[in-house]
Amino acid sequence: GRVGSIYENEFIFDIGFQVYNTAYSYTNSLLNVNEIDLKFFKPGARIHDGKHFQIISDPMRDISQLFSSLFSSLSSFSDKMKILLLKYELSNYSIEKDIENDCSTIEYLQSRGFSEKIIKLFFEPFFAGIFLEKRIETSSKFFKYVFSNFSKGLAALPSSGMQKIPNAISKNIKNDLIMCNSRVIGIKDNNTIILDNSKE
């Protein structure tokens, strides 16, 4: 996806991906994470239930949220246990090794017995924002991959905006391999990109 920042009047407006997840090992291998000066968010989410905000968090990673998460009315005790079980089962998830039948994310969550309430208040708004869709119909395997990484990593932002990420990655790429303002119109032989200016 697109990653960048617009700098205007001392404000930073990030475009494309809004946070950096520290668990994505491939991205970490492409840049020096220390160079982009990450600032971290606490694990969890602040959710509005129609009346007021409540916090749902991972007490295993943020002990300060233990009681607020345990006694939150956003989800039943059963849902909380199912989330912890899902986190445990997907802790070392590999999408390449997943031999289970694929289905939509919403079907997967329903098959695991999550209540409609926790799906509507947590899973749908959180993952719809990631998948860019309303009803989380995205592949359950991709959901498991994303859930696993969010369970292990932390959401973070570079101190001077998301633009620091492509800037850092580009330092390790030869200048003649970077094409700016060029539209891709096709892929040839699975490894050659064709641009609209007829260059390959």
Roles of regions detected by a PLM:
Residues 2-44:
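Glycine-rich FAD cofactor-binding loop and adjacent beta-loop-alpha segment at the N-terminus
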Residues 7, 48, 179, 194-195:
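A general beta-strand register signal
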Residues 7-16, 88-91, 149-152:
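Glycine-/proline-rich flexible loop or hinge segments
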Residues 19-23, 100-101, 161:
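Soluble or luminal CAZymes and related metallo-dependent hydrolases
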Residues 27-28, 32, 37-136, 151-152:
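Mobile amphipathic helical/loop "lid" adjacent to a hydrophobic cofactor/ligand pocket
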Residues 142-191:
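Helical element adjacent to the flavin cofactor pocket in flavoenzyme catalytic cores
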Residues 196-200:
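Core beta-strand elements of the Rossmann-like FAD/NAD(P) dinucleotide-binding domain
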